[in-house]
Amino acid sequence: MTTSGVRVRIAPSPTGEPHVGTAYIALFNYLFAKKHGGEFILRIEDTDATRSTPEFETKVLDALKWCGLEWKEGPDIGGPYGPYRQSDRKPMYQPYAEELLDKGHAFRCFCTPARLEQMREAQRAAGKPPKYDGLCLSLTAEEVTSRMAAGETTVIRMKIPAEGSCDFTDGVYGDVSIPWDSVDMQVLIKADGMPTYHMANVIDDHLMKITHVARGEEWLASVPKHILLYRYFGWDQPVFMHLSLMRNADKSKLSKRKNPTSISYYSALGYIPEALMNFLGLFFIQIAEGEELLTMEELSAKFDPENLSKAGAIFDIQKLDWLNGRWIREKLSEEEFQARVLAWAMENDRLKAGLRLSQTRISKLGELPDLAGFLLKSDLGLQPSDFAKIKSPPEEILEILNTVQPDLEKILEWNVETIEAELRAIADRMGKKLKVVVSPLFVAVSGSSRSLPLFDSMAILGRSVVRQRLKLAAQAVAALVGSK
């Protein structure tokens, strides 16, 4: 594997809470750059205009900084190959699309969403994987010009060889062969003029002189499209490395429905960023038992991409807890520990906001732990009996919790007003009084029916912590339902 003049990148999409999987891939790239004296670049891939938000972009940058990762170039600090936000690079992509059209490597497609869905349904019914059937491939230049002049919506798709296979060497998987007839005629430029991930990432990687592309294994099947684009443009392709996905202990894909996946969740609960990076870094090195506690510098020294395993990286929270505890006890001095605790308590003004809400609700300072302590707890230790005093039957409580969890994910800006508005809307949709809906939420979020105002508490705790507490509450109530 050539490593001269190494430039690597992490290119997250700002469409939600920053995922630990992003930290996992970012850390690999960061360590790879450090190992080879290269440069680590941050690029924001916000081609999904409907889901990307400045708020989530800020959270991505803050989360990666909290992890202790530093980039040489990025949207916040600039660099010689900017802009580093794909939406700001939009004018750059169209000329490359026109080049592909002129060379006969791409074509305009006028198929409507309805027609494409009918096509996919027919393919699925026939037991075939859905992919574009090439209807617009045979359009003449005159037909294309006429339909565009008539104002028909068009996208640009890439042409794919009809036979043979794409053979390449991956830095992790070794020699890979993917038949061309399994590769879709990918949309390159969407109807709004924005490029898809496949088009933008190839162009950006080339223009930013990226030498090694390390990303999750879910992109392995897309490599033929990317290699083909490099060939169409006459560019040298980077070295591809596809890392095994992080998985739960049961080998299922890591997802927020089963375990907390957002970096902010671990930050909010008081995990040490060095411990989280230590935990993730262990997936990239080989060590003996007893050598697990490692700083970033030590991880970099032991890092060897040649020894990567294709086996899934198991995200074992118990091991993370163990490692985090060792960091607190063995790596932090008494002064550092006290400083970390104070910084954590004041993070996002959580403690200050809790004190402000508590002041008018207590008669003695000693009442604070019972009233506001839930804001700083990692685990409320909810039991089925905690919900027994709620007037609603357990079946109704469980229905409320299971309805609220996914609906809260629809909130774009997480604050008191949006939380209240969504919960009121949920109550209306369920045909229930707001009090009936929020009563179990008080217990789920704070562990008690007497607590600080619910909407304020949820806003202070943050989306990721609330998500996890609602999930654990639903499990407790499900046990109550099952015991009847």
From Swiss-Prot:
Recorded family membership: Belongs to the class-I aminoacyl-tRNA synthetase family. Glutamate--tRNA ligase type 1 subfamily.
Catalytic activity: tRNA(Glu) + L-glutamate + ATP = L-glutamyl-tRNA(Glu) + AMP + diphosphate
Short sequence motif 'KMSKS' region: positions: 253-257
Motif 'HIGH' region per UniProt: ranges: 12-22
Localization per Swiss-Prot or TrEMBL: Cytoplasm
Enzyme class, spelled out: ligase
Role noted for this protein: Catalyzes the attachment of glutamate to tRNA(Glu) in a two-step reaction: glutamate is first activated by ATP to form Glu-AMP and then transferred to the acceptor end of tRNA(Glu).
GO BP: glutamyl-tRNA aminoacylation
Keyword hit for Aminoacyl-tRNA synthetase: yes
Gene name, Swiss-Prot/TrEMBL: gltX
Gene3D superfamilies: 1.10.10.350, HUPs (3.40.50.620)
Pfam families: Anticodon_2, tRNA-synt_1c
Protein name as catalogued: Glutamate--tRNA ligase
CDD domains: GluRS_core
